[in-house]
Amino acid sequence: MYKKIIAKVALNKNDSGFTPYKYDLNVYRGCEHNCSYCYAMYSHKYLDDDKNFFNNVYFKENIAEILNFELSKKSWKHDLIGFGTVCDSYQPIEKDLKLSRKCLQVMLKHKNSFYMSTKSDLILRDIDLLKEMSKQFPISLALSIITTD
């Protein structure tokens, strides 16, 4: 089930010291990929929905507009952003909503580096943006492949 939420912020500060990025950007909360090794299920407890991480996917309808506002601030230092750190940014519904694509367009506009991982081939839809970004500033993509063994 998909549930719309309105984002108050796009970027969340990550001061754990365990990651190379200082800010997280999560377009979705919850994940239909249902990976057995998922480390992000804890994030649903903040939505009072901790038993339904793989069934209820929340999408932040206004995320691109908020991201554009935050990256436009004079105080923004172009820190590295972890894009989709709590769940995959290419959920099946992304094909219709295009929220991650809109966020990529904002990142291109502001020339802001990011790290993203996905297991979805839907990332190929955005290869035009990713190619253009890689010509202008550093980006890092990690792709996982599902196997049966």
Q: Each PLM stretch: what is its role?
A:
Residues 1-28, 32-142, 148:
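Conserved Radical SAM active-site core
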